[in-house]
């Protein structure tokens, strides 16, 4: 199974209501007719009140209206579907119904690491390092409902993939999994694929997709509030992240376009 993940907005001067009416009423029915579609689900953006810009919420933050996945048995099946109707993925002109900003990637069915359970190899050489809490570890209510901060990033041009992974998996996620209130933490390495000639889609731009799950209160205490937030270890190479994007969602608030009414799993 391969998952074609896409995040998008509607063009400027197109209202959210009009964009959703186009997406649900025009685009989705056409996608359902493509050959080889195994699963088709979408999550709407939610606003959980994370202030930005801030240390834990860089700008832009929560900038997409939806995260959607379209699943096929393999990449060849996706190619067949895409080539049958490439116009479905074109960007719309300003003030016209269709897609505005659109970012996509391919990932596998299962994460590379379920970080609350798994230890990436990069963890081990840094395992004895302690977390830096200048104000002390914050107290968190573990029973509050969580949201998912679903984010993607790529490494800076001056950073090799290996050096970027050493920092992200060796430091950032090793520290992140220890944050109080962290209850969901999974990361996928992107699957690189041959890009379609002339296509506007650039699925190989990104390095990883990560899902981080905690309550809004925990997120703010751990990563936003200057008095309580952790100070993550910085890379000696400087800023190794070249680009970043995210959307806030709840995994159980999902539109299943192939099986309307089916409960989220």
Go through each PLM region and give its residues.
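Macromolecular interaction modules
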Residues: 1-265
């Amino acid at each position: 199974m391969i998952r074609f993940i896409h995040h998008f907005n509607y063009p400027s001067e197109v209202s959210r209501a009009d964009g959703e009416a186009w997406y649900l009423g025009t685009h989705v029915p056409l996608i359902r007719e493509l050959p080889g579609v195994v699963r088709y689900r979408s999550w709407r953006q939610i606003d959980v009140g994370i202030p930005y810009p801030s240390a834990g919420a860089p700008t832009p933050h929560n900038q997409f209206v939806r995260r959607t996945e379209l699943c096929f048995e393999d990449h060849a099946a996706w190619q067949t579907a895409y080539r049958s109707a490439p116009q479905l993925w074109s960007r719309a002109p300003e003030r016209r119904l269709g897609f505005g900003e659109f970012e996509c990637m391919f990932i596998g069915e299962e994460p590379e690491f379920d970080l609350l359970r798994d230890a990436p190899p990069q963890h081990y050489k840094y395992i004895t390092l302690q977390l830096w809490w200048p104000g002390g570890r914050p107290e968190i209510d573990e029973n509050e409902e969580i949201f998912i901060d679903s984010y993607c990033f790529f490494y800076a041009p001056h950073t090799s993939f290996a050096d970027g992974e050493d920092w992200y998996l060796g430091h950032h996620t090793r520290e992140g999994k220890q944050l109080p209130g962290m209850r969901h933490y999974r990361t996928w390495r992107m699957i690189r694929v041959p890009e379609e000639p002339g296509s506007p889609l650039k699925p190989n731009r990104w390095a990883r997709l990560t899902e981080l799950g905690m309550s809004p209160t925990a997120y703010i205490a751990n990563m936003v509030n200057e008095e309580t937030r952790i100070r993550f270890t910085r890379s000696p190479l400087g800023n190794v992240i070249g680009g970043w994007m995210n959307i806030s969602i709840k995994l159980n608030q999902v539109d299943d376009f192939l099986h309307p009414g089916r409960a989220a799993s």
